[in-house]
C-alpha cells in the first residue's frame, strides 16, 4: 500500500470518528438547556406580566438576560476546554498518521507542534465558513451564538408582553408543546443552533490542529487535498472542492460551511497521493460501497442514476449536469465563485447560457 493511501485511509476513518465525537459534544449542551428552561419558567411564574409596566418589564428582561448570560458563559467555558483537548488530540493523530505512512526503509518521525502553537492556531486562524459567519475567530463565533440565543429568548418575552399574552402562553412559546415533543418551541431552535455551532467548532479546531502538524512537517508534506463525503447530503461547496489541492498556507479549510463534514488529507513526498488500486467510501444509489479514489464528487455523481442526481444537487442543476453538454470539470467550476461561495442558477446561466439552452432550461 502506498504511503499516502495509508494516510487517506486513516484520515477517512478518523473523519467518521470525529462525527461521533461531535455528537457526543452536542449532547453536553442538554443540561444547560434544561437549566435555561427552569430559570425562565421560575422567573415567569413569580408574577403576572399583564400587570407589569414597561419599565418593570425591562427590569425583568435584564434579570433574565443576566441569568442566561451566566448559563451560556459556563457552557462556553466548558466547550472551549473540550475544544482545546480535541485540538491537542488531533495534532497528535496527524503526526502518528504521517509517521506510520512512511514507506518501508524510510525512517521518519513526524514532529508535533507545541501546545501553545496549537492553541494559537485554533484561536487566531479564522473559520473558513462563508456567509454571515465568514472570517470569524472561534471565540466570536461561539459568542455570536450565545448572544443571539439570549436575544431570541428575551425577545420572546418582550413580544409576548406587548401582544397581551399570558405568562403561560409565553412559557409555551419558549418551551413548545408536549404534543410535538417540545420541538416547536424557541428552546428547540436554541438546541439545534447549539448543535450546529458545536459541530462546526469541532471541525474547525480539528482541521487547524492537524494543519499545524502538517506545517511542522513541511519538509515532507507538499500540500493538502480536499476530501468530501460521497453521498447525497454533500453541499455544493464541498462537491466542487472535492479533490482540489492547496498549498499548506493557501486556500480554504474545513469547515467551509456550518455543519461541514469534509476533511483534508496530506500529500507527501513519499509517493503519489493514491496508488492505482486505491479506493474511497461512498453511499450512492446502490448503498455503501468502495469506489476508485481518483474519482471526484462529480465523476462519482455522473455514475449515479438520474433520480439520485436530482436528489443530490436538485432537479434543475441535475438536468444541466446531464444535458447541458458541459464537461464535468466545467460544471464543477460553475458551482462556486472565486471566494468559494455557491453561485445561484441565475448566475450560472449568465456564465453558460448555451448550456442552459441545450438542457432546455432557458424558460
Feature roles, as predicted:
Residues 171, 181-282:
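Acidic, glycine-rich two-metal-ion catalytic cores of nucleic acid-processing enzymes
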Residues 1-180, 273-363:
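N-terminal leader/targeting and assembly helices and adjacent pre-domain segments
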